[in-house]
Structure formats: structure tokens, C-alpha cells
A protein has these predicted regions:
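Non-globular targeting/processing and membrane-anchoring segments
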Residues: 1-96
Length: 96
């Protein structure tokens, strides 16, 4: 429900992805917004890839907002979920 509530405030997914493609800079907020919309569109792996790219580029952006959002997605997916396990490892490898 948290992601659905967050997504209500955002532009539609196609619009966000178009803005992202045309953006010359690495717009982390736009990536975060798109990732939230991707989660609510059942495109979770794409969302995790996008968030991981933010963590890789600037771990501390907005007080680690991308990393914290990834953790919320892992919690949503549940323990033992293969996708969550894979991306948790990728995130851990970047951070350590």
C-alpha cells in the first residue's frame, strides 16, 4: 500500500520513462519516481535495477533514499524471494 500511495502523487509511468530517456543528466529523483511506478506496475526487477544504479552512483543521495526504498521492496517481496535475495546481494556488494 505504501508504494501505491506514493505512486498516486507521481506522473504516469510512460511520462516518467520518457522524461528519463530525454534527460541528459542522471536525474536521481526522476529515477526514484519511475522505480516507484514500476513497482506498482508489477515491474519490480526494473525498479530494483534503477534504484541500484542510484546507489552505485551516489549512495548518500537524499539520506540513502534509494537504498532505503530497495529495502522496502525487499520487505514487500518477503523473505526467501529469489529476486529480493539477488538484489540484496548486489546492493551489499556495492556498499561493502
Amino acid at each position: 500500500l505504501e508504494f501505491i500511495d506514493m505512486a498516486k502523487e507521481l506522473d504516469d509511468l510512460d511520462s516518467l520513462l520518457t522524461k528519463l530517456e530525454s534527460s541528459k543528466d542522471d536525474n536521481y529523483q526522476l529515477k526514484l519516481d519511475a522505480a516507484i511506478k514500476l513497482v506498482t506496475s508489477d515491474r519490480v526487477e526494473e525498479a530494483l535495477k534503477m534504484l541500484l544504479s542510484i546507489v552505485q552512483a551516489d549512495r548518500m543521495w537524499e539520506e540513502e533514499k534509494a537504498r532505503k526504498t530497495m529495502i522496502k521492496i525487499f520487505d514487500l517481496l518477503g523473505k526467501g524471494n529469489e529476486l529480493a535475495t539477488r538484489y540484496r546481494r548486489k546492493m551489499f556488494a556495492l556498499l561493502h
